[in-house]
């Protein structure tokens, strides 16, 4: 009924993690940047004449969060986390915390990204993170990773919410955590200070 649907909608959260968004849409204004030659007033005055007015909205990583909420009428707590390759994992951790803290009865956690863009490949290659040949994640000869597009969603709910619909509980998230050592994108402090 309508009342139950409203409660479901208000008590269902959405947590989305991504690597950061679609940078190719920012290419629209690169020619204008070159022409303006660091003259910000000129750049600002000509921006609306040279760039699609939706360019910024097309690049936002929280678009996925918005579309999920709108499509499924989910109005509970939500967050968009952009943190390179761990964004999806952070979304699961945040969704589980929302359930544990009583902010929601259920939450969908989503991870997505499509980082295959020239500047990202170059950036990761210069850091030595791109495999020189085949991807060999479990081989002693592995020497990096490869980019790929992907998305996954996981529906989490409290034990009480599962019981109310007669669902079998398949697993439990006991905890999760993350840290920032401010040492760089992939660096970890020798003393592991931020991890402990």
Named regions from a protein language model:
Residues 1-3, 61-72, 78-110, 147-167:
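Active-site-proximal alpha-helical scaffold in enzymes
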Residues 11-15, 104-109, 135, 170:
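Short glycine-aspartate micro-motif
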Residues 1-72, 77, 112-118:
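Conserved beta-ketoacyl condensing-enzyme motif
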Residues 18-21, 83-87, 111-116, 175-180:
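Acidic, glycine-rich active-site loops and adjacent beta-strand->loop/helix elements
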Residues 49-57, 78-86, 142-146, 185-186:
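Flexible, glycine/proline-enriched loop segments at strand-loop-helix junctions
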Residues 130-196:
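Condensing-enzyme catalytic core mediating Claisen C-C bond formation in acyl metabolism
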Residues 25-29, 92, 117-123, 183-186:
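Short acidic, glycine/serine/threonine-rich loops at helix termini
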Residues 32-33, 124-128:
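Short, hinge-like loop/turn segments at secondary-structure boundaries
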